[in-house]
A protein has these predicted regions:
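Conserved active-site motif detector
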Residues: 1-112
Length: 112
């Protein structure tokens, strides 16, 4: 499967870039009841809670990464990402765990 990347933004409303370190694993959780964005996915850390959101606007999604709406159908309700790059306004992460299983032919090929 081709690697998938997402952009985390909005962290300046929480703890800034301080919680983010290259290689750090972050839990992402779909938030369909979010009043501002039905496709919202929050980024969380166990000890401190919400640290940002997966970008879902063409103005905030880094080139080459998926938006919250673009990744939502490919991942489970909770999934894990790994921090790859950090800038002052964006954190680029690779999705490392929590993909939905493919059904049909691809699943049959995996069993062989």
């Amino acid at each position: 499967m081709k690697e998938k990347y997402i952009t985390i933004v909005g962290f300046n409303h929480y703890y800034g870039v301080a919680p983010f370190k290259i290689g750090k694993k972050i839990k992402c959780v779909k938030e369909p009841s979010n009043p501002y964005d039905g496709e919202a996915i929050k980024a969380t850390m166990k000890q401190i809670g919400t640290i940002g959101y997966v970008a879902n606007s063409p103005y905030t999604v880094a080139k080459g990464t998926k938006s919250a709406g673009g990744i939502a159908h490919k991942v489970k309700k909770k999934f894990t990402v790994e921090v790859m790059f950090i800038t002052s306004s964006k954190v680029i992460c690779k999705v490392v765990d929590g993909f939905k299983e493919k059904k049909g032919l691809e699943l049959l090929e995996k069993e062989d």
